[in-house]
């Protein structure tokens, strides 16, 4: 069903409105950090062959998301009822992740006793502006086609602050743990390199290495031409190279690559 979901998200995409874009879902389900145990509970609503609604979870599994096609808002009540009854709610931690343009879901949630507990800003860059941060001396860009999975997994391990769990080692060992491990980090990267998800555009990823070849910064890129959307996910810099402008240089590289393709 991945193509059904992707096409649905792309078809109803509206910048800054209506929920997460297509890469959000596909990036999550192909990632080794994602608990897919309860993915069978994700549900599509169809009108004939046309997808008109979707309820799904991400990480943690108690975070529930909604997507609905304009004109089918009458399904919101049914979708919320389904989420409450069937989607994971361990330790009463189920929460609905709602966005601008999803007021109909907010209203239905409030009727059932939900209340807003926090909000956050979804950052977007307008390509009418310009990004032109220079790569610091001593670093260089790595061609995405030449990526070394072990180096990239190590970058993500430390870049996402997992170093407190231990050093990045024994990455090829058997992984018998539910916690995040070097094995899971490596498995996720290796899988994405060897067998990319259907709509992956890893050829636009940005990888920055130091003079010794250690990967210092990684910025993934999902290009959705139908939406003119350049979706950056993920982004990390290893601790010893933070606050040096590497992420800014990576985003500038994305800008110079994606703007000529039509990104807005």
What are the residue ranges of the model-derived segments?
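Short, high-confidence coil segments that cap the C-terminus of an alpha-helix
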Residues: 40, 91-92, 260-263
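Extended hydrophobic-aromatic, low-complexity segments
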Residues: 152, 217-219, 228-233, 241-245, ...
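Conserved acetyl-CoA-binding loop-helix of GNAT-fold acetyltransferases
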Residues: 73-85, 237-239, 243-260
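A conserved beta-strand-loop-helix scaffold within acyl/acetyltransferase catalytic domains
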Residues: 20-32, 57-61, 163-235
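Conserved donor-binding loop and adjoining core beta-sheet/short helix segment
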Residues: 10-87, 216-230, 238
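Short amphipathic alpha-helix that is part of the acyltransferase structural core
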Residues: 1-27, 134-184
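Active-site beta-strand termini and strand-to-loop segments that position acidic
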Residues: 46-48, 125, 209-211
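Acyl-donor-binding surface of acyltransferase catalytic domains
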Residues: 58-63, 68-138
């Amino acid at each position: 069903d991945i193509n059904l979901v992707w096409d649905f998200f792309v078809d109803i995409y509206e910048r800054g409105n209506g929920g997460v874009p297509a890469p959000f879902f596909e990036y999550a389900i192909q990632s080794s950090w994602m608990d897919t145990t309860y993915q069978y509970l994700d549900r599509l609503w169809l009108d004939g062959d046309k997808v008109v609604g979707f309820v799904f979870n991400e990480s943690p599994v108690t975070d529930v998301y909604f997507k609905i096609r304009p004109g089918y808002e009458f399904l919101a009540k049914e979708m919320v009822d389904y989420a409450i009854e069937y989607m994971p709610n361990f330790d009463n931690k189920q929460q609905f992740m709602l966005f601008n343009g999803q007021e109909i879901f907010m209203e239905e949630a409030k009727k059932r006793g939900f209340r807003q507990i926090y909000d956050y800003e979804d950052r977007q860059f307008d390509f009418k502006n310009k990004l032109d941060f220079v790569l610091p001396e001593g670093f260089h860009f790595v061609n995405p086609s030449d990526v070394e999975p072990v180096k990239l997994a190590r970058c993500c391990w430390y870049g996402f602050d997992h170093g407190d769990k231990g050093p990045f080692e024994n990455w090829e060992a058997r992984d018998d743990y539910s916690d995040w491990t070097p094995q899971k980090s490596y498995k996720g990267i290796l899988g994405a390199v060897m067998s990319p998800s259907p709509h992956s555009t890893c050829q636009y990823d940005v990888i920055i290495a130091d003079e010794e070849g250690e990967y210092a910064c990684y910025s993934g890129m999902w290009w959705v031409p139908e939406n003119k959307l350049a979706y950056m996910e993920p982004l990390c810099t290893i601790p010893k190279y933070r606050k040096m402008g590497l992420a800014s240089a990576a985003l500038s590289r994305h800008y110079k690559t994606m703007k000529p393709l039509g990104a807005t």
